Amino acid sequence: SYDVLSLNTGSYVPAKEAMPVDESVFTVKPIEKLLLARQRILEDLKDKDLKITVAGGGPTGVEVAGNLEGLAKNESGRCRITLVAGSRLLSGFKDSVRKHALKSLTSRHVQVIEGARVLAVKDCKTELSNGDVLDNDYVFMAVGVKPSSLFIDSGLPVGQDGGMLVNKFLQSVAHPELFGGGDCISFQPQPLAKVGVYAGRHNPILLHNLLNALNGGVLQEFIPQGTFLLALNMGDGTAVVRWHSLIWGGSLGFALKNYIDRKFMKAFQA
């Protein structure tokens, strides 16, 4: 039993629901799977050329493709990397962001396929929606995330993505004793992107509201920021950065991203 409950179950990449179990297919979450993939790729690069397919044209797919190229280059290995971007690379962002990312990838011989998505992976072959079939040694699925089925299975009100539907106080719209944050919620006042900046800003609001729900205090609203810094690590010591209307790429962008990320991680070191 409980008086209040905070649900923070995160999200997962649903790709394997439609894919066979295959040791060559890796989803980008949980992150420990990427460490295993990195170790295997480094071992394979010692004695053979690799063909790697990345499925998903969002920020994660772009970063994974770029960093795979950087990994192979650092190891003096040969690797053909193909990014299957769906309808369009970085389709939810301004064209200038897309152009910077596309230029970075293609200048390093990463093939970017737009207007197609991955349908199936079997026997080291990837079938695309445009009819093409790619040979591959590894496939990385970065096709977006979805919340756990816990909320639908429990009969709670959910948003279109299946996340627990919450109000401005991060409370379930039907059960005020239930709270939640991060990727597992659907924010009723307005749709929010599944990005870490929102999840991080949920935390102090959740703590405040959980404590005040217990002692009868005033709850605090979560007010999403209008825009947030986007910085894509391209894997070669550069980043594509968007801040409000300012967009640029280069080593300065990577230095900024590296500083912000390390500062954030340091704050939560045990």
Describe each region flagged by the PLM.
Residues 162-179, 223, 236-247, 253:
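FAD-binding beta-loop-beta segment adjacent to the flavin cofactor pocket
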Residues 10-13, 145-147, 237:
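Short glycine-rich anion-binding loops that position phosphate/pyrophosphate groups of nucleotides
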Residues 6-7, 140:
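N-terminal Rossmann-like NAD(P) cofactor-binding module of classical short-chain dehydrogenase/reductase
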Residues 70-168, 218:
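A Rossmann-like FAD-binding core segment of flavoenzymes
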Residues 73, 197-225:
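Internal hydrophobic alpha-helix adjacent to the cofactor/substrate pocket in enzyme cavities
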Residues 23-48, 133-204, 208-209:
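FAD-site-proximal beta/loop scaffold in flavoenzymes
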Residues 230, 236-270:
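C-terminal auxiliary extensions adjacent to catalytic cores
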Residues 7-55, 59-74:
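Glycine-rich dinucleotide-binding loop and its adjacent helix/turn
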